[in-house]
Amino acid sequence: MKKVLIGCLGILLMLGLTVFWYLSRFDSEQDLPETAQSTLRETHTGPVLGFSKNDVNVWLGIPYAQPPVNDLRWRAPREPVSWSEPKNATQFGEACPQGALGLSGSEDCLFLNIWSSQSEGSSKPVMFFIHGGGNVIGSADQGGLYDGQRFASEHEVVLVSINYRLGPLGWFSHPALRETESKAFAEDDNSGNYGTLDIIAGLKWVQKNISSFGGDPDNVTIFGESAGGW
């Protein structure tokens, strides 16, 4: 009886998260914030321009890998293509494809977001957040639920959140996927754990770039909610 009750509660929680996610898709669009020149930062693939919100600098929708589409579908994430002009980082990137009540999202979804307290001093601790959703739904912003501005301000940290591939696009393996000759294979292409590899790629991006955003690459804490905390 106890196992049945726990199972029912788990199903209800998943349904609740799903309904919340899809209802959030219908929220009216808000005006995008104006970029602030003071937030111009260099990454190893190109400059990004964010905005300031109260006492926090914010960068949204920074690509940490190439879009996993076409020949890169069911492959380990690849380094993003470099750019030269400042990339506008004022809007969350698309969520990864998902759908219990209908398909939403985009395969071009490998983005991360950064909130950095403007407090003076040495490099700040970095908190790396992984969203939940049973590895089948969810995103780094979750319809505005995961806005890291207050967290970064109150705790004087650099908060990073990330999208990663979900469902069968994130965890899937089949011999047919290894038979194509259209793309050179990387070492981890056959793992089937593409969502996990996305998260690892995000952490590698943090190691290379977070010092430009006021963070300490040697002081990174990984945390998450539900599936993101397992």
What does each of the following model-derived ranges do?
Residues 125, 206, 213-225:
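Alpha/beta-hydrolase fold nucleophile elbow
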Residues 193-200:
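A generic "alpha-helical surface" signal
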Residues 7-193:
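Non-catalytic accessory segments of hydrolases
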Residues 20, 143, 217-219, 229:
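Non-catalytic, mobile gating and regulatory segments of ester bond hydrolases
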Residues 113, 200-208:
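Core alpha-helical elements of the protein kinase catalytic domain
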Residues 135-136, 224-230:
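Glycine-rich nucleophile elbow surrounding the catalytic serine of serine-hydrolase chemistry
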Residues 165-168, 223-227:
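Short, solvent-exposed turn/loop segments enriched in Gly/Ser/Thr/Pro and often Arg
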Residues 1-4:
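Positively charged n-region of N-terminal signal peptides that target proteins for export
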